[in-house]
UniProtKB/Swiss-Prot annotation:
The active site is at C2 (nucleophile), K607 (for fru-6p isomerization activity). Residues 2-223 form the Glutamine amidotransferase type-2 domain. This is Glutamine--fructose-6-phosphate aminotransferase [isomerizing]. GO terms for cellular component: cytosol. GO terms for biological process: carbohydrate metabolic process; fructose 6-phosphate metabolic process; protein N-linked glycosylation; UDP-N-acetylglucosamine metabolic process. PROSITE patterns: GATASE_TYPE_2 (PS51278), SIS (PS51464). It is found in: Cytoplasm. InterPro entries: GATase_2_dom (IPR017932), GFAT (IPR005855), GFAT_N (IPR047084), GlmS/AgaS_SIS (IPR035466), GlmS/FrlB_SIS (IPR035490), Ntn_hydrolases_N (IPR029055), SIS_dom (IPR001347), SIS_dom_sf (IPR046348). Keywords: Aminotransferase, Cytoplasm, Glutamine amidotransferase, Repeat, Transferase. It comes from Ralstonia nicotianae (strain ATCC BAA-1114 / GMI1000) (Ralstonia solanacearum). Its main location: cytoplasm.
Amino acid sequence: MCGIVGAVSTRNIVPVLIEGLRRLEYRGYDSCGVAVQRDGQLERARTVSRVADLDTQAQSSHLDGAIGIAHTRWATHGRPDTVNAHPHFSGDTIALVHNGIIENYETLREELKAVGYGFESQTDTEVVAHLIHQAYTYPSSATRGHLFASVRAVVKRLHGAYAIAVFARDNPDVVVGARAGSPLVVALGDNESFLASDALAVAGTANRIVYLEEGDVVELTREGLTVADARDHVVEREVKVVEAHAAAVELGPYRHFMQKEIFEQPRALGDTLEGVQGFAPDLFGPRAAEVLPKVDSVLILACGTSYYSGCTAKYWLESIAKIPTQVEVASEYRYRDTVPNPNALVVVISQSGETADTLAALRHARELGHTHTLAICNVATSAMVRETELRFLTRAGTEIGVASTKAFTTQLAALYMLALTFAKLRGHLKAEAEEVALRQLRHLPSALNAVLALEPQIIAWSEEFTRRENALFLGRGLHFPIAMEGALKLKEISYIHAEAYPAGELKHGPLALVTEQMPVVTVAPNDALLEKLKSNIQEVRARGGKLYVFADADTHIQSSDGIQVIRMPEHYGQLSPILHVVPLQLLAYHTAVARGTDVDKPRNLAKSVTVE
């Protein structure tokens, strides 16, 4: 959520800043802006519209400059309007953008008012701008005239999670950035330097990347950087050559990124499984062979779609590996009393590796005495990967659409391999069963292609869903989390209220909602619970509900009055959830398209939730 781009150069940097914002649009935003220093003055453009409109505004006002910052805002403090949009100015001296939340901003605001500062916005960001102005300009300030030192002094007073970028009107050679809980990277080019929330923002412009650590403050000049760490010591940070691909933010032949990413899943799974020859601990890092045999239980922490992948993994870990597993919503875990088990493996799951609630839960678990940690993540350079003992990197590639698709299925593949690795270590996986599982995993990409071929039938269903405002999703056992994920997808991009229940819970409440106007989506694999599920289907039919069933071919569930069936290509045993979630993604996508919603940027949602 939110995006920062900053630059100091010898050329007009506005086109690069705005292109950077365009590449960060996937993170979610409701306003955007850009500021530069030109002819000794601060100038800016802001809008509550899209980045394309900001570009038009900047061009029409002939905005240009060799130093600048830009921002996409996702409102937290203050409604989405131009006054609250970033960049914020303090006087005619300081320009600043900020991601995150300053928790003690009200106290700081009152202090600033008491010494004469006025506020134009309702944001916590303006407080930071004024604090830096005070440190940079006041005659009595020990850091007067030194922007790097001023920012280092100010961040010590801030409570919360943030990333900032700031420059001063009278110093057109320096941009300063700081991060605490929100990601920020530096990119170094030829006689120019950049700050960004994501290296993708400057892909193709600069490829020498520095990933700032927690608590770092950085001074950028055209020649390079100086970094001060959380203890205010000047330190060196490793420079890595990273080839981020700008093509990741191009649609190609697809209408939306979500559609593109749904159809990229066979490739994403193939890449994630590449080189897997068996289920050995070293899949999860060099220390895994030492750590995993000591583990007697698993604690999974995640949010949103990643939480549902964790719920699916619980079934695998307990049924295949016979290891007790607990799954917690990360935002809840850290605020309740728990009984820590030092022999548990804490598994954190996140596409970005920067999800604030999950990172906070990980840190809380470590404070409680959990020493064994594993990240399932799609970004190798993320905070989550850096802060865990073990890791498995999915290779989904950049995911732009807010509604996660390929990240989810690759997470499932990683978690399935974790279950099989534990099973092998604990003596529950024979060599023959390991070979069968490997063959199934290798066949997954082609099996997914067969599922994607069902799209025309799913489009026909979506036309009926377009006219509905509510939907129920049903699943049993291993496929209940898949029903939850299907309901989440439908509600977040089509704005249809959708809820998922274990099918056996119908008679305990949800059946009261079933009418002819209530579509009921059911996931029906040919597993041990099939006959129970068929009984639940009959309960819905008896109340006049309209059933939409994704059924394995050998279930003998037939389309008839009140029930429509799409046949899945094949039954895939324990891996069936990876196949069954894909038609639910397609159903949500085509329903949203038919309803005319903004599929890739649904209202009020952000891709990477980097504030609590």
